[in-house]
Amino acid sequence: MHRAGGKRLWPAALALAWAATAGGAVAGTLDRIGHDKAIRIAFREDAPPFSYKEKSGAPTGFMVDLCRAVAKHLGDQLNLTEMTLAFLPVTAVDRFAAIASGKADLLCEPTTETLSRRQQVDFSIPTFVDGAGLLIRSDGPRSIKALAGRKIGVLAGTTTEDALQNTLKEAGIEAEVAPAKTHQEGLAMLDDGRISAYFADRSILIFLAQQSKAPEKLMLAENYLTVEPYALALPRGDEDFRLAVDRALSHIYRNGEIVAIFAKTFGGKAKPSGILETLYLIAALAD
């Protein structure tokens, strides 16, 4: 039993204390994190290289490692000597509900910020920028126009699914869109010849191609077909928490931590592109 001033806190008093800290109107996300010394991180198990599970089962990837760094900075802001990171697996379908319902504090995966999504959750300053493209078979069609009458795979419930439909419509191309439950399922469909191309963010496609049964038979189409600005999703309306997360990210960008996180994910000699360097320079807010 916890002691305060040498006196016991009996169950009734504990219940009242919990009610005061649990109410969203009384205590925000930062207060709860400080009270529990824990932060709840939602991540995807199937979105490498940004958010996925290692063979050991541990969450990893660029966004996961970035959120680990954010959590450390939040702990420093709250003067915590330790912080527990509780990871919650989510899918492309239920990820925003995990934040909106209060099950998780941060969504750490390749999340594209959009106006419609802002109706459900808030977003941090930008964390990455990517673009969607096509992973194709080297013996098949090599452009979006050449895919007329073919099957194109895409992850269901994502902005890339909407972008693919819009791209086909604007180009006047009739092709069958084959939704995949996971990127790995999409890769399997491409490997087996059930689809002629797989549509996703290019960084994800590069990683997927390396996992193919026959990577030498796959290639990336040249053109970017969309621009995807990533950010961390967090509870809507909690300005104090968003400010704390943005402060943490700004410090990570300014002190060079972001370069080490990037190198860990994309290879020891890999560095952020000129576009990403500019993004981090602009996004990092001064104290």
Show where each model-derived region lies.
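Acidic, polar ligand-binding/catalytic clefts
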Residues: R68, N79-A146, Y224, I282-A286
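Periplasmic-binding protein-like
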Residues: E45-D46, T127-S138, R202, A209-L249, ...
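Beta->alpha turn/N-cap motifs
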Residues: F43-A47, L88-V93, G102-T114, R137, ...
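Extended ligand-binding regions for polar small-molecule ligands
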Residues: V64-H73, S138-P141, K145-T159, I206, ...
